[in-house]
Amino acid sequence: MQLIRQIPLLISVFWLSACAALVSVLIPLENVAKPTGEYQVGTQVIHMVDNDRSAWYGQESSNPREIMVRVWYPAQPQEGDLKAPYVYNEKLIGDMVSEGFGIPKYLMKNLRNINGNTWSEAHPVNEKFPVLIFSHGIGGLKTQNTTQMEEMASHGYVVFSCDHAYDAGVSIFPGDRIIFGKTNIPDNLTKEEKWNMRRAQLDYRAADIQFLLDEMDRENFLSVALKNSLDLEHIGVFGHSFGGGTSVVVASVDERIDACFGLDAWFLPIPSNVLNSDLNKPFIHLGQVSWKEKENYLKLDTLAGNNSAWSVRLDVRGATHYDFTDFSQFSKLTKKYGSGMIAPPRIRKITNSAIREFFDHYLKNGPALALETYEKLYPELIIKRY
């Protein structure tokens, strides 16, 4: 504990003495928490091309849409299988995170040392499991909620996540082709033009998820073994920030999706016709107590209030936007760069429990989410029923 209190002073000393590289030795990053389920977890990275859509609006629109997908699934590791890294291309990812959060780059050098709990290309368990699809926020990554991906796969789900190219912080394609995010809004646009731009991005994101769903029933990109492990009669979507809004939109238009979960979701870009319609699917939102944009949660309340299926809102005292990702899980220093006061193990437990029990009920016919029990177990929760 004494070292933790002295970290700001240590950083200043090392920085000023040009020995900043040593700080990464003094401040290691935590590994991904071990999942609690019965299954070991495999992972694969898949390059998919949608020839029916253009890459993005703008200069690249003449090329087909490409997305990089990562999948986590119940696995049977064999002798000789290797553990997968938390992220590939860790230096590039570390630099991107550093720039996005204002974190000194030398503090991200240990990103390569974060250990996950998955086996690369391990053979899938020979059973069928419900499918989940995750959507990241603006500037996010497909791996940003690896904690939840591994947890859900260990409990018998196949979890897909894609980099929404041009909207992700960075997408790395075969041949080391790199596409950085290009979705910043120009300052010279009117308010109406800005929201039209966001809705165009939202449409592309939702179409990415629908393309993923289409490909799960084909053999263009998925191995036969992985395809055979998919229970396509039970599908859920979840997402963080803009990805939460994306999940709502795609759930509202695609009958293949059975349930939807938002993690501190951004509702402002969602069209009014979606908010004012009946989602008619179970929906839960887990997020911070309030947003600076007060209208965000007003739109959440409109969506949930119009939903004829079960809806609930769980607000977490002491949490901020990035506590609902892996960001706060790897170092106490993240509290200096945007994570909240809630302890990392605590927000991890709340998030994992809510996601697992929600989808267990609606995709596996498990017990209903016991909100009265949640109120006792997690006094930091504010629960709103609709």
Segments and roles (model prediction):
Residues I114-F129, F134-I172, K292-K294:
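Short substrate-entry loop that stabilizes the transition state in hydrolases
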Residues I172-S229:
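Alpha/beta-hydrolase active-site loop
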Residues V23-L132, P344, I355:
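Domain-level recognition of soluble alpha/beta enzyme cores
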Residues W72-G80, P85-M96, G100-G102, T143-L189, ...:
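Active-site machinery of serine-nucleophile hydrolases
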Residues D258-H321:
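The feature captures the conserved acid-bearing segment of alpha/beta-hydrolase catalytic domains
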Residues P28, A33-P35, Q40-G42, N51-D52, ...:
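Alpha/beta-hydrolase-fold serine-hydrolase catalytic core, especially in secreted/extracellular enzymes
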Residues L212-S277:
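Primarily recognizes the serine-hydrolase "nucleophile elbow" in alpha/beta-hydrolase
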